[in-house]
């Protein structure tokens, strides 16, 4: 199976998600992008798209926005796309009803070297605790948060000049660098997962 034969549905919302969205679009058959609905923001109440929706529009990708993740018609829509993997980056927790849809599983990119800083705000915790390094982890999603089998990890140095923005950018790019090898590892070497 070549990479372009691997069907991906991507779930994400933030700027942190975008490098991996591009990597998935460049390397795989990206069937759809699921993101939150556009919202009115600021004083002028302008309608703003999520960063993921903005990029998906620029790339002319199929967008599914603002859905109830447990809605039967949404679930059927995902099944009809015949995904091999879900790739989830900076999105909400997927309900159990979705986890069985992709043929091989759902992969999350988390911005820490799991199990350290499991859960919310891992970048902030690494900075507050003055760590000298952190990293990203790819793992298979299980019903309990950040507990699935780890596929791969990449360590990133934290410099004295790093702040949330700079470290988040480094980690988002590192996650994008891992996604292709992580998917191929799941397909061909699943017995090696941690």
Task: List each language-model region with its residue ranges.
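Donor/substrate-binding cores of folate-linked one-carbon enzymes
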Residues: 26, 85-194
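N-terminal beta-loop-helix "entrance" segment that forms/cooperates
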Residues: 39-59
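N-terminal Rossmann-like dinucleotide-binding module
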Residues: 1-44
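Internal alpha/beta domain cores that form substrate/cofactor-binding pockets in large enzymes
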Residues: 9, 31-34, 62-81, 86, ...
């Amino acid at each position: 199976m070549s990479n372009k034969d691997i069907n991906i549905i991507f779930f994400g919302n933030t700027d942190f998600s975008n490098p991996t969205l591009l990597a998935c679009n460049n390397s795989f058959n990206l069937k759809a992008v699921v993101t939150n609905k556009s919202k009115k923001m600021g004083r002028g109440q302008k309608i703003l798209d999520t960063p993921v929706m903005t990029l998906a529009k620029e790339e002319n990708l199929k967008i599914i926005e603002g859905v109830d993740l447990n809605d039967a018609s949404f679930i059927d829509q995902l099944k009809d796309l015949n995904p091999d993997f879900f790739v989830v980056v900076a999105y909400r927790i997927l309900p159990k009803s979705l986890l069985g849809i992709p043929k091989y599983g759902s992969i999350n990119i988390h911005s820490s070297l799991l199990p350290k800083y499991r859960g919310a705000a891992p970048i902030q915790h690494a900075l507050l605790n003055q760590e000298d390094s952190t990293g990203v982890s790819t793992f298979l999603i299980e019903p309990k948060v950040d507990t699935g089998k780890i596929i791969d990890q990449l360590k990133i140095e934290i410099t004295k000049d790093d702040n949330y923005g700079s470290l988040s950018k480094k980690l988002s790019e590192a996650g994008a660098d891992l996604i292709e090898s992580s998917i191929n590892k799941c397909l061909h070497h699943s017995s090696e997962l941690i």
